[in-house]
């Protein structure tokens, strides 16, 4: 399955000057919501991701995603794996588990995002779950921006990667684009970064 073509065909690979949720600036932006608006394609992508995870023979009892961006990807992945799905969300800028969702002690959970950039949101989600007694066994995403080390990828983890090196990150593809700190972004000389994502900075 050609993941990059899926993003291009869905007009989900945007070019311009963007402020990413990680705080970095980039000339490209992946808008996974455009890919996931097609239920059939969302199902196919999740099945591809589930296949990778199943081949690793991990015991996964639940998938959890940080809202909002990860919810559709996480739900479809949970469906493909045949496990339950929950999500965390921000309340006063703090990641929280609400809506009656509960986790059992030592419940084995995979944290799923639509896109992993630095993994900061995924780690905030994981921390909430671990504080409630869950065991994080892996991370997953449709796309990886190439900062975090992906299972089955030749790319190494880069500076700024937040995910722990001892847990696997499953993703369908690496999308490696130039990213800049706002203080040294060359794009800022000619334009202002726009924020098309799902959360503020």
UniProtKB/Swiss-Prot annotation:
Its cofactor is Mg(2+). Pfam families: Pribosyltran (PF00156). GO terms for biological process: 'de novo' UMP biosynthetic process; pyrimidine nucleobase biosynthetic process. GO terms for molecular function: magnesium ion binding; orotate phosphoribosyltransferase activity. Pathway: Pyrimidine metabolism; UMP biosynthesis via de novo pathway; UMP from orotate: step 1/2. Orotate binds at residues 117, 145. InterPro entries: OPRT, Orotate_PRibTrfase_bac, PRibTrfase_dom, PRTase-like. It is an enzyme of class 2 (transferase). Catalyzes the transfer of a ribosyl phosphate group from 5-phosphoribose 1-diphosphate to orotate, leading to the formation of orotidine monophosphate (OMP). Belongs to the purine/pyrimidine phosphoribosyltransferase family. PyrE subfamily. HAMAP family: PyrE. This is Orotate phosphoribosyltransferase.
């Amino acid at each position: 399955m050609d993941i990059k073509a899926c993003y291009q065909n869905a007009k989900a690979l945007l070019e311009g000057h963007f402020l990413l949720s990680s705080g970095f600036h980039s000339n490209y932006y992946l808008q996974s919501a455009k890919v996931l608006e097609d239920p059939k394609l969302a199902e196919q992508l999740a099945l591809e991701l589930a296949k990778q995870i199943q081949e690793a023979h991990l015991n996964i009892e639940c998938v959890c995603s940080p809202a909002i961006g990860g919810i559709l990807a996480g739900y479809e992945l949970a469906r493909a794996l045949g496990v339950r799905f929950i999500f965390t969300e921000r309340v006063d800028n703090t990641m929280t588990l609400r809506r009656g969702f509960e986790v059992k002690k030592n419940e084995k959970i995979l944290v799923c995002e639509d896109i992993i950039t630095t993994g900061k949101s995924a780690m905030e989600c994981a921390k909430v779950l671990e504080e409630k007694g869950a065991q994080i066994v892996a991370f997953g995403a449709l796309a990886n921006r190439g900062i975090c080390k992906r299972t089955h990828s030749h790319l190494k983890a880069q500076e700024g990667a937040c995910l722990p090196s001892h847990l696997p990150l499953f993703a369908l593809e690496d999308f490696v684009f130039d990213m800049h700190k706002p203080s040294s972004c060359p794009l800022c000389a000619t334009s202002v970064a726009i924020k098309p994502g799902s959360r503020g900075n």
